[in-house]
Each structure stands twice: as C-alpha cells, then as structure tokens.
Amino acid sequence: MRILIDADGCPVVDIALKTAREKNIEAHIFCDTCHVFEKDGAETHVVPKGADSADFAIANFVKCRDIVITQDYGLASMVLSRDAICINQDGCEYTEENIDGLLFARHTAKKVRNAGGRIKGPPKRTKEQDVRFSEKLVEITERFCK
C-alpha cells in the first residue's frame, strides 16, 4: 500500500503525509512544473505542465490497494479500475457505486458553463473538513493494513 497525492491544488498534502509517516506507508506526491512540492517523507514526481499530465502519471503509477488522494473524478475513475482506493480532500471515498453519478454531474456542470451559465464554487475550507479527511484516511489505512 502506498499513498499517492494529486498535489496540484490539494489542501491536505501535509495531513496525508503525517498519516503516511505515522502508519509507515510510502508516500508519493505528483505535481506539474507550475506547482513543485518538495516534502520530507515523500517522493515527488514532477511532470511536464499540461492538461491532466499529473493525473495520467498517477494513473500509470497506481497499483492495486494504493490510496490515491484527488479531487478529479476522471482520475478517480481510472484509479478505481486499477483496484485502488480513492478519496477526495474532504474524505469522501470514490466507489464503483458513486463515480458514474459524479462524472455525470461534472458533465452536466460543463454543459451549463459552456452555455454561459455560472456554477458557484466551493465555500472556504474549514477545520472540520481537515478532521474528516484525516479520520477517513486513517480508517482506510487501518481497514487495508489488517
């Protein structure tokens, strides 16, 4: 088991790395050349800048039972097809049961934006979201390290 972090725009990198250290789990950070992260306790993979370049690097690197942290539904779908675990920065676990609905919602939102509509962005991040993420990550590591 490894923890792979889609670090571009990810607010929980430090929380994930703390859990990886505590559980003695190998950690990898993926970012493009515009967002280089160098963190102790993790191997950083820097990919060329480009649409979804970090996502494809993760999809090619992920193995069965890895944990991937991302907010990208497309990447989550690819990760699930590799029998890995995938959660977002709020601690929501992507599953075979919910990914199709999430991808459809993303498609619908894109159609609204392309038609000139506006979709409200997320509210400011809270400490409760950090706690929820941390608890979920610990729960997943304990579930699969038994």
Regions found by a protein language model. Give the residues of each.
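Nuclease catalytic cores that cleave nucleic-acid phosphodiester bonds
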Residues: R2-K146
